[in-house]
Amino acid sequence: MFHLITIEDKVRIAPSQFNNEVQTIEDEIEKKYTSKVVLNAGLFVALYDILGTGDSYVHSGDGGAHLMVRFRMVVFKPFKGEVLEGVIKKSSRQSIQISLGFFHEIYLNPIELPNPSNYNQEEGLWYWEWNENQLFFEDGGRVRFKIDQVEFNPEISQPAPSPKNVNTEAMDSYSLREYKEKQIENENLLKQVKSPLILKVSMREAGLGMVSWWTNQSAGDDDENEEDGGENQDDEVAEDDGGEEPTIEEDE
C-alpha cells in the first residue's frame, strides 16, 4: 500500500532563504507534491528524508539558487487485489464514499456490493439482504474492501491507460448490460471526482463489507467451540497451504 521511492528534482531557493536552505528545500518539495500524484509511483503522502543536493546555479535575471535535490518520499499506491479497511464517509444512491483518513476519494459503485443489496431511501443507506435480514452499510462504519483498479484522473493527472479490448459479442445479455453500466459509472466518476488518484473497489467476496458483520460471526464461532468442551481435541490439525521531470527510483 505504501512505498518508499527516491526522486531527483530541481528546487529553487529565494535569496531571502539562503540562510535556511534545508527547511526551504523541505517546504518547496511539500508545496510541489502535496495532493499530487507522482506519475507511475503513486499519491504523495510525506517527505521521508533528503539524501543530498547538487551544485547551485543562478540564472540570468533570477537571483534565486537552483539546485538538484535527491530525496525520498512515501507514496500511496495499493496493488490490484489488495484488501484494505476504511470508514464510510457518505452514502447516496449513486455510490458509497470511503475514507482512509489521509485519502478520501474512494467511491464504491453499488453494483460492487454483496448480492443482493438495495438502497433504503428513508435511511439514505445501502443494505445487504442476508437470511431475510437487512445488514446496513452505516455512515461512519468500518468496512473492508478489495482494490479492483487504480487509475489516474485525466482531469488532474496523466490520462489513465486505455482499457484492453473487450469482446462484448461473447457476453450474454446480463453481462453486457452490467459491463455497459460499469463503463457509464466510470466515465461519470472521472468527471465528478477532483482527485488525482481514483480507486475502483468492490465488496462482493466473503469477508468483505462491514467489519462488524464478520467480527460478530467470529465471536459466535468461538462461543460454539467453547461449548463443545474440546470434544475434537484428538482430531488431526490440517496443514497450511502456504497475496525536466523528476527521476524516480523505487526502494527495495
Curated annotation (Swiss-Prot):
One of its GO terms (molecular function) is DNA-directed RNA polymerase activity. It is found in: Nucleus. It comes from the Eukaryota. Residues 214-252 are annotated as: Disordered. Residues 220-252 have a biased composition (Acidic residues). GO terms for cellular component: RNA polymerase III complex. The keyword Chloroplast does not apply. One of its GO terms (biological process) is transcription initiation at RNA polymerase III promoter. The keyword tRNA processing does not apply. Keywords: DNA-directed RNA polymerase, Nucleus, Transcription. It holds the Pfam family RNA_pol_Rbc25. SUPFAM superfamilies: N-terminal, heterodimerisation domain of RBP7 (RpoE) (SSF88798), Nucleic acid-binding proteins (SSF50249). CDD domains: RNAP_III_Rpc25_N. InterPro entries: NA-bd_OB-fold, RNA_pol_III_Rbc25, RNA_pol_Rpb7-like_N_sf, Rpb7-like, Rpb7-like_N. Component of the RNA polymerase III (Pol III) complex consisting of several subunits. DNA-dependent RNA polymerase catalyzes the transcription of DNA into RNA using the four ribonucleoside triphosphates as substrates. Belongs to the eukaryotic RPB7/RPC8 RNA polymerase subunit family. This is DNA-directed RNA polymerase III subunit rpc8.
